[in-house]
Each structure stands twice: as C-alpha cells, then as structure tokens.
Amino acid sequence: MSNRNDADQLRRDWADSPRWAGITRPYSAEEVVRLRGSVQVEHTLARLGAEKFWRLLHTEKVVAALGAMTGNQAVEEIQAGLKAIYCSGWQVAGDGNSAGEMYPDQSLYPVDSVPKMVERINNALLRTDQIHHM
C-alpha cells in the first residue's frame, strides 16, 4: 500500500471507530505513516487481548478479574470462568519482580518485571490453547 493510502485508511479509522472518539491528536495521519516505516510489526497476542478487552468493556456490565502472578494461576482463572486477568503492581513489587526482591508498592522494581510476568502468563495460556486444539 502507498503512504497516501495508509494515511487515508488511518484517517478513516480515527474518524469512524468508536475506539478513537474524543481523542485529539497534535499530529497528522501522514506524520504517523512516515514515522512508522514500511514494515508493520504485528503483536498478535497484544492485539487480540486488547480487542477482546475493549469488546468486554463495551458489552459487559462488570468485567471481573483476579490478579495472577504465574501462568498456572492465569490458566486456572480462565478455566474458572473469568474473562480477564489482572497483573497487580503490588504483586510484582512484593514477590513477582525479576530481581527476586521485595519492594514497596511504588514501582521501584526492575523495569522488565511486568513484561516477564506477562510473557509467562501468555506462554501458559498459549500452551493450554495448543493442548485443547490437538
């Protein structure tokens, strides 16, 4: 696709999608297309999770979630019927950080702690999905 087509498509998405309602941007669609380059990196799990959560927020009265520190906890929560998983900053600070230390709940733990926790949770959910689709 050309940069012009990409910018036109992005502009239409911003105008038509309820996801972007009320957002004011100090930049143009052309600037976004120019800065992001020609290769679109796809983060499938993040996109699917964000789309599902957005849909839940707009269709469910309440979206119940419990904190999960491990992949197994996340799998059990989903198997129990929860539709969302919460990654608690307090849990990361207290016991789930990559330094293996205990920190106060002030985001003082190593910066890679939450991404590593999410990676473990995603890996467990992916493996469970693979097992159930064999």
Residue ranges and their predicted role:
Residues 56-73, 105-108:
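Active-site mouth loops of central-metabolism enzymes
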Residues 15-16, 26:
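Mature N-terminal, pre-catalytic/accessory segment of carbohydrate-active enzymes
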Residues 41, 84-115, 131-134:
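Glycine-rich, proline-tolerant flexible connector loops at the mouths of alpha/beta enzymes
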Residues 14, 77:
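Conserved, mostly hydrophobic/aromatic
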Residues 123-131:
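Conserved helix-loop functional segments at active or binding sites
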Residues 32-54:
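Flexible inter-domain linker/hinge segments
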